[in-house]
Amino acid sequence: MRNKPILCVDFDGVIHSYTSGWQGATIIPDPPTPGALKWLWKATGWFDVQIYSSRLKDPLGRDAMLEYMIKHSRVEFGDGHPMTVSRDFPITFAHEKPAAFLMINDRAICFDGDWSELDPCDILAVTKESPDAPISYPVTEIPE
């Protein structure tokens, strides 16, 4: 049997809506982003779905994330579904960034191989839109 390709999915801002910002590795207060759980369940048919998050640096972060996923999956799918049972949970939590076929992340830029098209100032402008980005960037002069 051929192994499925790894699909690495970020947690905060992608699965967890993250509207309250960072509260700690074990505090996950916001609902899932609309459609996330159904999409992830469907993706398990084609991919080895692995969730990667900075929350996993805390030993209790994985448990909090699994609890969150199961709790919200019960609402989405009802009891008895594989997404609602800890021992059958079809998605893994990667303690380090996996060698993924593809990644889904709300804070990433798709690199096309041309560094000349990737302007650091443009990146700063985009990240300034983020609610937990620093207030100001002391960029006064761009090095050539």
Map each language-model feature to its residues.
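Catalytic phosphate/metal-binding cores of nucleic-acid and nucleotide-processing enzymes, i.e., regions
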Residues: 1-144
